[in-house]
Amino acid sequence: MCFSLPSINKEGYLFIVVSFIVTCIAFSISWGFGVTCLFPTLLCTYFFRDPARIIPGNKDLVLSPADGVISKIEEVSYPLSTNNGEEKKFTLVSIFLSVLNVHVNRIPISGTVKEMHYKKGKFVSAMSDRSSNENEKQVIVIEYTKGKEIIVEQIAGLIARRIVCNLRVSQSVKAGERFGIIRFGSRVNIYVPTDVEIRVSEGQTVVGGETIIANLNKENTQEKLTFDLV
């Protein structure tokens, strides 16, 4: 039997190393103190885990950008600079991430990054729907075909004060690729066109890069899937 350690996201290296050093010092002082310090070290390692995912390869599928639970699905309007600032209709799928979820974010669909905006704001608890409008966030607009966009928002929370996004405007992206992380509990919103088939429901648990959020081609209900391990 082969045993392998879980992959750790690079954003967690500093936290884990510092926690490990503190734990070693604590054990040198007393066994009980060391055990007490060991718990946050293990928790930190668990939080920054970055497991490989089996990515569906069909280009018509929109994948979940994050692990978590679907807290809301509703039709909304969203202003885009690529649309001269005018609002366009989208279906919002909001995903809540607890501190126990994998917090690595993944690209929902292949395309090109057309816009990126970092909006300053509050740090309301990510459990509240208010966080979508009031909290600090990173907005990413991905054009998957000419004139068609999907929007992803990485939203900070009460504990999550650090959003990491490793994308740039005009960058080509592939569905399922890692693109960032939000530290310690958060929310991720994805906005898809209103004319697509939504494949999830409120209260459903989703897995980033694996769970199908929507099908862009309603007529293709029997899509043939291929898979990649990423």
Swiss-Prot record:
Coiled coil stretches, renumbered: none
Cofactor(s), by name: pyruvate
EC numbers, comma separated: 4.1.1.65
Single GO biological process annotation from the record: phosphatidylethanolamine biosynthetic process
Entry's cofactor comment: Binds 1 pyruvoyl group covalently per subunit.
InterPro entries: PS_Dcarbxylase (IPR003817), PSD-A (IPR033175)
Keywords: Cell membrane, Decarboxylase, Lipid biosynthesis, Lipid metabolism, Lyase, Membrane, Phospholipid biosynthesis, Phospholipid metabolism, Pyruvate, Zymogen
Pathway involvement of the protein, from the record: Phospholipid metabolism; phosphatidylethanolamine biosynthesis; phosphatidylethanolamine from CDP-diacylglycerol: step 2/2
A GO MF term: phosphatidylserine decarboxylase activity
Membrane topology: Peripheral membrane protein
Recorded GO CC terms: plasma membrane
Site (Cleavage (non-hydrolytic)) location in chain: 185-186
Enzyme class: lyase
Subunit structure: Heterodimer of a large membrane-associated beta subunit and a small pyruvoyl-containing alpha subunit.
Function: Catalyzes the formation of phosphatidylethanolamine (PtdEtn) from phosphatidylserine (PtdSer).
UniProt cross-references to NCBIfam families, sorted A to Z: PRK05305.1-2, PRK05305.2-4, PRK05305.2-5
Name the UniProt record assigns to this protein: Phosphatidylserine decarboxylase proenzyme
The organism of origin for this protein: Wolbachia sp. subsp. Brugia malayi (strain TRS)
